[in-house]
Amino acid sequence: MKQPTTNKLRFTITLVILFLARVGIFIPISGIDHQTFNNTIQQNGIINFLNIFAGGGFSTIGIFALGIVPYIYASIIIQLLIKLIPYLENLQKEEGEIGRQKINQLTRYLTLLWALIQSLSIAIWINHMYLIHLFELCASLTTSSMIAMWFSEIISEYGVGNGPSLLIFQNIISSIPKNLQNYTFNIGTTNTVLNGSLILSFGIIILIINILIQEGERKIAILSAKQLGKINELNHKVIFLLKLNQGGVMPFVFASAVVHTFLFISNNTNSKITQFINLFLPNQFLYLPLYLIFIITFSYVYTSLILNPEDIAKNLKKMGASIPNIRPGSETIKYLNTRINRLTLIGACFLFTITLFPTITYYIFKINTLKGLGATSLLILVGVAIDTAKQIQTYLYHTYDNMME
């Protein structure tokens, strides 16, 4: 009967930490004119993009303004370096738990460095003239970012769900009531019911596409030497799964980063290059085709980093397994490469479709409720909700099994 108590403790730890992380966003750092700062950042696309993941922390420069963002970026960089540096790749694959701990420690160090860089950039951007205020701001933001990282690790180990994902989920979903409030405040038109119904329909379509992307898989049958030796086991198929969207939200993140870089260059320079860049900015005809190209490109790049057909073929060979009607070796690699490329293209097109719906909703109804969420946010919300629900279901199954025993 210990399992139910353990589950209660997991849920309690998760809820308490999420509450503390949310409260920290609203504790302002002293020495800043927050009203003036909030008015300034409204036109800054990069800050608004980060503000979504900070749950509004950038609008007030609360102590948790950076939140989990430095840890997320550090984790992304480490994952990329693992694929590029053989030592780190060997550390992850061959060293087991010790290697995992070393990689986690590297991620923490990089998080600290990234938090220092981001906090210093914010302090300089605010134009703090006094050294003591600059130091106070950097120390507050960096320390709180490390606390947020610690919170996320506690949730992952002792709570329910993935810690970093839940913190981002909480920050994103907290912006929805404000968007809905802005919508209900402006419902003075005669077509409110029709517009609301159409927006609800768009929302359901987006939700369905998100679930298809998150849960979409390509099943590939695997036949092992053990199965060939036992006729009874031939009926029990071993399945190898390829996800429709291997890159997750990363194609969105990279594509958005490039677009915001273009926007930054356009706003801060004045040359012939700027005039050319302006053709690809939001609200321009070439923006969506360019964004589609970026999403497809980054989907292929990121998928190639996290999923290598050669490694899969080698592992199958080590296990004495193969794909039916496909010879081991080069034919298996070619077969997997073809399937992965097709899935990546389909997944990238689905991702682009998600980006279209909030934009279409905004231009048709002039309502930024969905547009404010963004495609990245919607994908994260659905993905985290599905993963957390699966973990909760697993805990409940274990509880039920123990009670039956």
Curated annotation (Swiss-Prot):
Keywords: Chloroplast, Membrane, Plastid, Protein transport, Thylakoid, Translocation, Transmembrane, Transmembrane helix, Transport
InterPro entries tied to this protein: SecY, SecY/SEC61-alpha, SecY_CS, SecY_dom_sf
Quaternary organization: Component of the plastid Sec protein translocase complex, which is composed of at least SecY and SecE.
Domain of life from the UniProt record: Eukaryota
Keyword Magnesium: no
Family assignment from sequence similarity: Belongs to the SecY/SEC61-alpha family.
Protein name: Protein translocase subunit SecY
Ranges in coiled-coil conformation: none
Signal peptide: none
Compartments where located: Plastid, Chloroplast thylakoid membrane
Function: The central subunit of the protein translocation channel SecYE. Consists of two halves formed by TMs 1-5 and 6-10. These two domains form a lateral gate at the front which open onto the bilayer between TMs 2 and 7, and are clamped together by SecE at the back. The channel is closed by both a pore ring composed of hydrophobic SecY resides and a short helix (helix 2A) on the extracellular side of the membrane which forms a plug.
Primary localization: plastid
Topology of this chain in the membrane: Multi-pass membrane protein
Ranges that cross the membrane: 12-32, 61-81, 112-132, 149-169, 193-213, 247-267, 285-307, 345-365, 367-387
PANTHER family named among the record's database cross-references: SECY/SEC61-ALPHA FAMILY MEMBER
One Gene Ontology biological process: protein targeting
GO CC annotation: chloroplast thylakoid membrane
